[in-house]
Amino acid sequence: VNNGIGLGTKLRKYREHLQVSVAEVSAATGIPESDLNEYEVELRPPSGDEILILADYFHCDFNFFISNEQLAPFEQTEILYRRYGSEFSKIDRWSVQEFLFLCECEEFLMSVVPILPRVEFRFRKTGTFYKGHGAEAAASLRRQLGYATNAVGMNVYSDLRKIGLHVFRRKLENSNISGLYVSHPTAGKCVLVNYSENVYRQRFTAAHEAAHAILDDGDEVIVSFMDGRNTERNYAEIRANTFASQYLVPPSFIKSIPNAGSWDTDRVLEWASKLQVSAEALTHALVDAGLVARDATGHLKTVRVPNNAKRDPELPSDLSPASRERRQELLSRGLSVFYVDLCFRAYEQGEISAGRLAEMLLVDETSLAELAQAYGKRLFYAE
């Protein structure tokens, strides 16, 4: 262990980011308060075991505490809470911390169990027409992923993972936050989608945050809000909305629909359901494609696809009600089928231990067996 220079500041800052007291850290880790106070003012360093315990508690790589390298998204969370601190409750701050931890884990797992071939995608912006950037980037990504002009992909999460983005859905207390993008120093581009939104809105948010990852990659942190604050004045937000709209509802596709210039509420409902987008998103796309006049969309936007008719691409339709409920609960904590499968594959191939598997799945070892059962997986030591 090094001499603890800077380690105390890291501990104190993490504690402040997560709004926990020294007493709370002590109660959770078993490290006496007096010792923690000494570590924070750098009177002496923690032991090696204590560093591991603290790294586990704060959901970060223990090497971050003992080296000067940027191994944790520390500066990014510092920016996040300095700019938007009042928007994030204590619970939501822990949710963000766990999300960033899952991104680190997924990046590691993809290096040892590369189950998804990564597609190299770079988009170079030219000129200052922001809306044009969004449209061109959406068309470019669709081409790169091999979509025909008249084809639409239904699993936006899978598409985004193919280009190396870490996409996790997580329920946040603040329902006004639709999503956020973080540039992680080791995991790369990370997208969080608020699971408290409806299924269609989550798809749009995922594509919107992906646009920030692709087009605003000079930014360390971007938070998007449901109330659309600053959207009218913020060209980057307009660009991200354009990207999301044209990725999920490509102009080339809607122009190929029979009688593409004739729309009523029933037809909007039918195609919004087929394309898994809101009626509002579809009508915006129709206007942008020049198929419907903007002043004729008022009644079309108000149509609502019933929530029970909305399909989630990451929830198989053949699940029993009990299994579906359990999977939804896990999804709301960030545990997608893709990520869970990745974790278990690494475990089955001997890349990680059962203890590390539990840690990566945000459960203790006693809950691991139950989670394995929910996903039809096996634990070797349970045999």
Q: Predicted segment positions?
A:
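Active-site hotspot residues in diverse enzymes, especially metal/ion-binding acidic/histidine motifs
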Residues: 1-383
